[in-house]
């Protein structure tokens, strides 16, 4: 039986919360940006999502871990978060798909976690004062000392975290969505023309790749630093700019690559970080949100059409800057009216701030992958 030990969460402004953790082989202090996610389900997908790199995630739902961990519901091949915060972590999980408990999964990967704190109070605090750096510690419980340690770490603004999560090597991808991912077999699969898609990996979620493969695309994933000439050498029918962590304005090499790609009129689809990088390349600007959008029930839409979407980002495209660029707004976040999607007025470029691949979350926006297929097909037919 794992031994319960005292733990503490400290925020950079000095606020702190006392709770509990379990004894791990390696006791240490972990520091990262403290954010909250409002999803009731999908904790496994969340903690393995590379977009959460360098972040300590607080789950607002009062208990997580009930269904354990399995080898399918992962969005990368390692845990991405720096730490986990919960009101309660279920120690006796149950699911026919379970292969290990959440506690064992976190402990075996030396991911610090704290439970037994008032996560509602913490969430309200972050909403009022904004997301900020913080730490979880079981090694040293002196909050004054820990506050000093936190202040040594830079804030998320200005951080380029892509080198930590992008692939080091080019690789093909052909794994499709799991058979039970859809409740219907009525899925259009485009097999007449096999479209070549280059995915620029800023921290791509695996289900983005699965959705493209399911629709019959020939996928090649390339590192974020890949030179333009190497990308064009594949003669792609389309470019997908993936999700990823950090401040998009700090990813200068990615912005420059996309800026140069615009000269070739190759269809581009941006998701989350990719959305921000595409808009920065189109001369728009981004800014840091006070506490971000992280959850699986965010309404997005325009002109009386609404999609319930999965979102995970701390930055957004500045609305006034879009008016000075060649794009139009296609979606707004209906909670705070920030931009949730844009499209180019003349060229085949479009992007969304949310996750159409869900995992976790609803499938309302999955049609965007179909839209990408249609845009690539039309563009390919024009060339031929």
From Swiss-Prot:
Protein's cellular compartments: Plastid, Chloroplast
GO biological process: 'de novo' pyrimidine nucleobase biosynthetic process; 'de novo' UMP biosynthetic process; glutamine metabolic process; L-arginine biosynthetic process
Molecular functions (GO terms): ATP binding; carbamoyl-phosphate synthase (glutamine-hydrolyzing) activity; glutaminase activity
Binding locations of L-glutamine: 51, 244, 246, 273, 276, 312, 314-315
Enzyme class (EC, first level): ligase
Family: Belongs to the CarA family.
Subunit structure: Composed of two chains; the small (or glutamine) chain promotes the hydrolysis of glutamine to ammonia, which is used by the large (or ammonia) chain to synthesize carbamoyl phosphate. Tetramer of heterodimers (alpha,beta)4.
Function: Small subunit of the glutamine-dependent carbamoyl phosphate synthetase (CPSase). CPSase catalyzes the formation of carbamoyl phosphate from the ammonia moiety of glutamine, carbonate, and phosphate donated by ATP, constituting the first step of 2 biosynthetic pathways, one leading to arginine and/or urea and the other to pyrimidine nucleotides. The small subunit (glutamine amidotransferase) binds and cleaves glutamine to supply the large subunit with the substrate ammonia.
Name of the protein in question: Carbamoyl phosphate synthase small chain
């Amino acid at each position: 039986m794992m031994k319960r030990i005292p733990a503490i969460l400290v925020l950079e402004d000095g606020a702190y919360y006392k709770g509990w953790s379990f004894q791990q082989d390696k006791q240490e202090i972990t520091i990262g940006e403290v954010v909250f996610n409002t999803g009731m389900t999908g904790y496994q997908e969340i903690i393995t999502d590379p977009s959460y790199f360098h972040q300590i995630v607080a789950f607002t739902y009062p208990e997580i871990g009930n269904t354990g961990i399995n080898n399918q519901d992962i969005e990368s091949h390692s845990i991405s978060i720096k730490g986990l915060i919960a009101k309660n972590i279920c120690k006796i999980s149950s699911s026919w798909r379970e292969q290990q408990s959440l506690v064992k999964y976190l402990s075996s990967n030396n991911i610090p976690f704290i439970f037994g704190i008032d996560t509602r109070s913490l969430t309200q605090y972050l909403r009022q004062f904004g997301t900020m750096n913080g730490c979880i510690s079981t090694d040293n419980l002196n909050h004054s000392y820990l506050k000093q340690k936190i202040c040594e770490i830079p804030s998320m603004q200005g951080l380029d975290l892509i080198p930590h999560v992008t692939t080091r090597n080019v690789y093909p991808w052909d794994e499709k969505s799991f058979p039970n991912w859809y409740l219907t077999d009525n899925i259009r699969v485009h097999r007449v023309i096999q479209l070549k898609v280059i995915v620029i990996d800023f921290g791509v979620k695996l289900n983005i790749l699965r959705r493209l493969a399911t629709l019959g695309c020939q996928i090649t994933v390339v590192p974020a630093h890949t030179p333009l000439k190497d990308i064009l050498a594949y003669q792609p029918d389309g470019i997908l700019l993936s999700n990823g962590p950090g401040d998009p304005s700090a990813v200068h090499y990615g912005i420059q690559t996309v800026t140069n790609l615009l000269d070739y009129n190759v269809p581009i689809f941006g998701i989350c970080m990719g959305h921000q990088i595409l808009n920065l390349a189109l001369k728009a600007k981004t800014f840091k949100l006070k506490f971000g959008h992280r959850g699986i029930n965010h309404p997005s839409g325009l002109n009386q059409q609404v999609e319930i979407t999965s979102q995970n980002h701390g930055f957004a495209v500045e609305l006034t800057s879009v008016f000075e660029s060649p794009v139009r707004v296609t979606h707004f976040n209906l909670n705070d009216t920030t931009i949730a999607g844009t499209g180019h007025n003349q060229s085949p470029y479009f992007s969304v701030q949310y996750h159409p691949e869900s995992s976790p979350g609803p499938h309302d926006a999955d049609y965007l992958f179909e839209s990408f297929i249609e845009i690539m097909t039309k563009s390919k037919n024009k060339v031929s």
